[in-house]
Design a protein with these regions (language model features):
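Outer-membrane beta-barrel translocator domains and adjoining extracellular loop/strand segments
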Residues: 122-127, 183-193, 226-232, 280-294, ...
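Extracellular low-complexity, Gly/Ser/Thr-rich intrinsically disordered linkers
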Residues: 428-455
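Bacterial N-terminal signal peptides that target proteins for export
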Residues: 2-14
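Outer-membrane beta-barrel "beta-signal"
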Residues: 438-440, 466-480
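Detector for outer-membrane/organellar transmembrane beta-barrel domains
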Residues: 295, 302, 306-434, 438
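N-terminal periplasmic/intermembrane-space "pro-region" immediately following the signal or transit peptide
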Residues: 2, 19, 25-125
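Transmembrane beta-strand segments that form the barrel wall of outer-membrane beta-barrel proteins
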Residues: 169-180, 272-276, 316-321, 371-372, ...
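Outer membrane beta-barrel
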Residues: 94-280, 296-297, 301, 305-312, ...
Length: 480
């Protein structure tokens, strides 16, 4: 801004210039006798005014320069302040939570699970969150017990964004829980559960063609991954596992193809998988020396799947060939030289209004490697299944009733399992469960009761007996 004193000086100079322009007119009115003197005076005055005019121009240029500099300084200050404000606002999102390969995003998900439980018997697979079938013989495994179990707690990393080419994109998952045993057997080992790998696979997806190829360790096609029984206590080991519900995780490859990709109505899909062969011997079960690993004999499965808005159904077939002599023919005279593992499964789910009904039935033989026949291995034929009904009487409260049963051929079980006077052959099992659950946001809480009745026989000629067990649990779960 120009000061008042400067404006005054500029006004006086302008007035002087105006007067100077008027002086020549007055000079023509003077007499000739005074002409030369007057001309000299006028010339001096003009020179003086020209000097003042030059000073005025210099002052104007100085004021313009000062104004420009002030404007630039103000603009720079405003830009600095704006940049500082933007930096402060953007600071919380400066770095991603996870970093991976360029173009690949990583997401961490999972849940924390805790169950306080009481039992009147010891169960097989374990007590607490993996209790399934009462352990035998009855006398050695009776007695009440209680505890708190958190081993269902699970987390996984999902990787997305990778590209194979223009048509195929990629993704993957690594999944862990805490059913990997314990840190030793000392007094404090039970409070130190060990993580275990559940799944580790990569997906190649052709979205335009409705094709997915999955490679790695994943659930086989018999396991009802999208149709498991509802429970807050039995998650890693679902209700009825080995007692009407079968399936297991194996390394392998699955090809999944949409059959009516992009069409309206029910969605049809065909899945075909080949998985690592496995059995309970005769060689090492952790060094690829079982009857399922002998030669090249993968487990082969196919599943036809259909789903709509409130229902789904699928049918699965399973086949594997087992060399009972083992790798390198280490067993000279097995009960049978070879076994064909065959299974058929039909499963479904329906959600009419507040109700949910789901279940499955299966039949086959030699299914021990997928938790068939209560995890008994041999050429054992069996039939089993489970059913569950759930009712949401409010958006947050629900009640669930469950029943499962497995009935292997008793003669087959005795032949293959009860080979010594102290061997226990599990002949039939029935399991029932009832739960009340409350869910709100990321949290779920519930109370659950499980009852299991087992019929068994000790030794090839032993008496057939019944044993039952109960578990009551209070459960909480937080999803993230």
């Amino acid at each position: 801004m120009t000061s008042p004193s400067t404006q005054g000086r500029r006004g006086m100079l302008a007035l002087s210039v105006a007067c100077a322009l008027a002086l020549p007119l007055g000079a023509h009115a003077q007499s000739s006798t005074k002409g030369s003197t007057r001309e000299q005076q006028l010339e001096q005055r003009v020179n003086q005014l020209e000097q003042q005019l030059a000073e005025l121009k210099a002052m104007i240029q100085e004021q313009k320069a000062a104004t420009s500099q002030a404007t630039q300084t103000a603009q720079a200050a405003q830009a600095t302040a704006q940049a500082a404000s933007t930096k402060v606002e953007a600071a919380p999102a400066a770095k991603p939570a996870f970093s991976s390969a360029p173009g690949v995003s990583v997401a961490l998900h999972g849940f924390i699970s805790a169950s306080g439980f009481g039992q009147d018997k010891t169960f097989t697979y374990g007590n607490g969150q993996n209790a399934e079938i009462p352990a035998v013989p009855a006398k050695a495994n009776s007695g009440a017990l209680s505890g708190v179990d958190v081993r269902n707690t699970r987390f996984w990393l999902d990787f997305t964004g990778a590209k194979l080419n223009e048509n195929w994109s990629g993704s993957g998952r690594i999944e862990m829980d805490f059913f990997g045993g314990f840190n030793g057997t000392g007094a404090y080992a039970q409070q130190q559960p060990t993580p275990r790998l559940r799944q580790a696979y990569m997906d190649l997806v052709n979205a335009s063609g409705g094709t997915t190829v999955r490679v790695g360790q994943e659930w086989d096609l018999l396991f009802p991954l999208e149709n498991t029984p509802t429970s807050l206590s039995h998650i890693a080991f679902p209700l009825g596992f080995g007692s009407g519900l079968i399936g297991w995780r194996y390394p392998g490859v699955i090809w999944m193809q949409d059959l009516n990709h992009g069409a309206d109505g029910p969605k049809w899909r065909l899945d075909v998988g080949a998985f690592e062969g496995s059995w309970n011997g005769p060689g090492s079960t952790i060094n690829y020396l079982t009857a399922g690993n002998a030669h090249f004999q993968p487990q082969v499965e196919a599943r036809l799947h259909v789903a709509d808005k409130d229902w789904l159904a699928y049918f699965v077939v399973h086949y594997a060939s087992l060399d009972m002599k083992g790798v390198g023919n280490t067993v000279a005279k097995p009960i049978k030289d070879s076994i064909n593992s065959i299974g058929y499964e039909l499963s479904g789910q329906w959600k009419p209004g507040p109700w949910t009904f789901k279940g499955l039935i299966y039949s086959g033989n030699a299914l021990g490697q997928v938790f068939g026949a209560m995890s008994q291995f041999g050429d054992i034929s069996e039939t089993g299944g489970w059913v569950q009904g759930s009712y949401n009487f409010t958006p947050k409260w629900s009640v669930n009733a469950f029943y499962s049963m497995v009935s292997p051929n008793k003669d087959d079980v005795v032949r293959w399992v009860a080979t010594t006077p102290t061997s226990n052959a599990l002949l039939k099992d029935q399991q029932a469960a009832l739960s009340l659950q409350y869910a709100s946001g990321a949290y779920e809480f519930g109370v659950e009761w499980i009852y299991d009745k087992l019929r068994y026989q000790t030794g090839p000629e032993g008496e057939r007996k019944n044993i039952n067990g109960n578990q009551v649990s209070l459960n909480g779960l937080y999803r993230f």
